[in-house]
Amino acid sequence: MKRKKQYEKEFAYWFEKLNDICGDKQKESIEKDILCDIYVSCEKAWEYNLQRLNNRKIKYLLIGEAAPWVKSEGVSYFYQTFDNSGEDIQPITWIRGLWNVFCSSQPPKNSERKIDIQESLNILANHNFLLVDSLPFALKSDEYKALKRKTKNGKSKYEELVCACSDFLERKLKNTKIQWSKIPKIAFAFKRNGEAVIKAHRAGIRLPSGQLLKFNYNQIAATGNGFPSKKSLCKGWSCGNSRNRNNCSGSMDRRQKSL
């Protein structure tokens, strides 16, 4: 209960920034209570995933936008569901692409069985992978589209929002529970979001270890359909043809099985 109150307090802080940037018309469509519930649920899952890393040094960082908006079907967040395409359905395209950067086998079909979801996430952790969102708001797609429209000065409210919430991403990456490889590889999942994050962090992000995470436009891995693919991720991460992939079956170790 104490942790939940902390998350709700954090959300109120971020929501105030959103409120300051949105116009009155946009404010009317934003459902604060649902956004708060999604935020709390995602933060719990994020903390759990930090335990999963278990001193592994992050080599592959993927920066995303935010957890998807949901209202009636439960929170659909990467670190809770892995994939939200439905039980026994092939995972959505970008998750297949991500999986195949590291694994020669196909990713498991989605399942409601939590053990399958956790095993998939454990396998990615074994490959020193971390996904971090840059915004704390699971807004509806049309709400984000409205924010992304350019204003008269050539900027957008979306860029203002990413800049105003730049501490959200910075706090995530500076978490002392995360250990980093000597030269982490960075990719952005989405074009507009990546561009806004790069502008908001022109000097990069200095980690507690003294390492500097530097961002550039070559790291944007979004393809023509708006999502990253295996090829674009390999390009963003400068990882060649991923020749060191394995079939990823039975990749959990004993430490992860106990989580």
Question: Predicted regions: what is each one?
Answer:
Residues 92-107, 204-247:
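Short, flexible loop segments at boundaries between secondary-structure elements
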Residues 2-201, 207:
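A polyanion-binding, active-site-adjacent surface
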Residues 245-259:
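Extended, charge-rich low-complexity interaction segments
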Residues 1, 223-225, 252:
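Detector for methionine-enriched segments
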Residues 25, 194, 202, 217-219, ...:
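Short linear motifs in intrinsically disordered/low-complexity regions
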